[in-house]
A protein has these predicted regions:
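Charged interaction scaffolds used for protein-protein
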Residues: 1-13, 20, 32-61, 73-181
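Covalent nucleotidyltransferase core used to form phosphodiester bonds in nucleic acids
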Residues: 24-30
Length: 181
């Protein structure tokens, strides 16, 4: 289930879409890791105070690229390049748009895994490569990624690694079961 959010930018309503496919789409388009880029942007932005931020030209380009991928994912009819898309606006304020995109991304990444599951905690930060590896390990297709949030993928991965959950799903089918099917 992908999440969407409509943001008014320069008097134009723009829809952004966050789904589990975004890390892959971003990596394919820009050859970068969206998790690392969002983390760098959040640190550089320094809250909502424009004077406290350390945004440079590279940070602005990251922001534009992330915004573009999420907008293109919501509306395939927008131009095929970030530059073409940005030409549609007179102003595109990072301080107006980025907090809302980060909020949308945060909702997409939320997970429902409960603490009662006996999983080993990991100190490994989530990266696009790790996320895609987990998708492969649980057998998800690109079509599946478009329908799931990242939190849902993490839940599926956690349950696939949880022995208690795996035991409850293990059932052997008899010939009678196949005949009845």
């Amino acid at each position: 289930m992908a999440l969407t959010k409509t943001i008014n930018i320069d008097g134009k309503e723009v829809t952004f879409r966050a789904s589990a496919a975004i890390p892959r789409l971003y990596r394919v388009k820009f050859h970068r890791d969206i998790y690392k880029d969002l983390d760098a942007l959040q640190k550089a932005m320094g809250g909502s105070d424009e004077n406290a931020s350390t945004l440079d030209t590279f940070s602005l380009e990251l922001f534009e690229n992330i915004s573009y991928v999420m907008a293109k994912h919501a509306d395939p009819s927008i131009p095929d390049t970030p530059e073409g898309w940005l030409e549609e606006f007179n102003t595109f304020s990072i301080y107006q748009v980025l907090p809302q995109i980060i909020e949308l991304w945060g909702l997409n990444v939320q997970t429902d895994v409960t603490t009662k599951k006996k999983l080993r905690a990991t100190e490994r930060p989530m990266t696009t490569a790790l996320f895609l590896l987990r998708c492969i390990q649980i057998g998800l297709s690109i079509r599946d990624l478009d329908l799931l949030t990242i939190g849902m993928v993490n839940d599926l991965y956690a349950e696939s690694r949880n022995d208690e959950c795996q035991d409850s799903y293990r059932q052997l089918a008899s010939q009678e079961d196949f005949d009845a099917f």
